[in-house]
Amino acid sequence: GLPTVGNPNNYKYDPKIIYDPEQDRFICVLLNGTNQFNWIVFGFSQTNDPAGAWNFYKLYGDYAADTTWFDYPAISITHNELFLTGNKITYNGSWQTGFRQTVIYQVKKSDGYNAAPVLNYQLWDSINPINNVYIRNLCPVLGGGAIYGPEQYFVSNRNLDIQNDTIFLVKIPDTIGSTNTNLSITVLQTPLAYGVPPDGRQNTTFDNTIEDLTTNDGRILGAFIESDQIQFVNASLNTGNGSAGIYHGVISNVSSSPTVTGNIFSVDTLDFGYPNLSFSGNQGGNTSIISFDYTGPNAFAGLGAIYYDGSQFSDMLKIRQGDSVIDVMTGVQRWGDYTGSQTYWPAIGKVWVVGIYGKKNRGYGNYMAEIGIPSLAGVANEQQKKNAGKVFPNPAFDYIQAEFSVSTAQQVDFSIYDITGRMVDKLYTTYCKKGANLIQFNIAPLAKGSYVLKGVNTDGAIIMTNKFIRQ
């Protein structure tokens, strides 16, 4: 028979939970053990009380007896079904080198809700490789403003590549038992390439032995579909400034002739990791709230978010700033593997998020918050107050003037960035006197669009950062 759960490898990890607003129930998936002791555990709440009774099931991880186990679960739901994806890893192999393939479980929700003796499910494995390379890490696409189906989409990329422009769109078209059962893979090409992100820098001001926070890779970690459009996020290198940024992709015309575009949000003095996103309403376009962990050489690890209004990003909101560095192991510090994000169904526009921050004892702190569009829309105004600077005229065609104040005389480097965080013009370094300063810049060579003028002193402190529009 199969190995029992009673063994030294008996520990639980990677819990994933989702609320079903149509059935007013909860579904949970978690893993138990590794190698030959690996089990996938499914839980379905009997009522809308997650503290109440549940119906539990388990499936053996090494179902094919090929010395692989199931790792890194991700879940989504349609009207009738639960979808679970994960990676098959060889016994005693690392997640990097032991990867064999990604598989999909398609499960009837009603079996779990009704306490059926066994779960009725379909397993999708041996998914066709592209150029002899298996797709790795399929991220299920959640419904944005509602639960959809019967079709279920998944997205993926080449998460370990230094640079790549390929996005995979995978579709399971119908329910278990349907005659329409052909899984399809569409290979898309994005104009803006992504790349495996660097590890997150930590603040070494008080201890120069502190190691970086690992970003793992650039896999897609969150996605939703609304109005025939998919939005997704992953961590990526920003080649413009060398930092770890957030790659935000948009797949349009999903059901007919899909195309993909991408932008990168980054801050040169910060590194971002483990992003997620949720739909936050339609105000002339599908909006979203993107949350992520952040860290930097001048900041302790914390939890942040931005708002995407359908065309551009807001400034960054620091939801929970860290109290200290993270230092719990030898060498590079673990940072992931997830953050959480969930649309608040009773009030679309609000999102619940959870992530990591550095505690005073140098350990991991978890922080959960409800945020909404008003919280993020006010970030730009708050930052304007902090830097007490302004740019005028705005919009402008040829010249802008920057007015700001500094507390001491100092040298300041001025640069211009586009809305993706890419530096487009390093202007010059100039001496700024104590008190008020007024400096003029030529913006005529810039293409029309929105930009950010940033001034940073020799210590790396941001003196001013102001948006402007080149007409």
Predicted segments, located by residue:
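Extracellular Ig-like/FN3 beta-sandwich strand-entry sites
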Residues: 348, 409-411, 436, 446-450
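Short, glycine-anchored, charge-dense loop/turn motifs used at functional sites
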Residues: 416-424, 451
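C-terminal PAP-associated
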Residues: 1-376
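Residue-level detector of functionally pivotal "anchor" positions at catalytic/ligand-binding pockets or at interdomain
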Residues: 373-392, 405-407, 422
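C-terminal tail/sorting-segment detector
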Residues: 440, 448-471
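Short strand-edge motifs at loop-to-beta-strand transitions and within beta-strands
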Residues: 435-441
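Non-cytosolic beta-sheet module surface loops
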Residues: 236-238, 293-294, 403-408, 443-445, ...
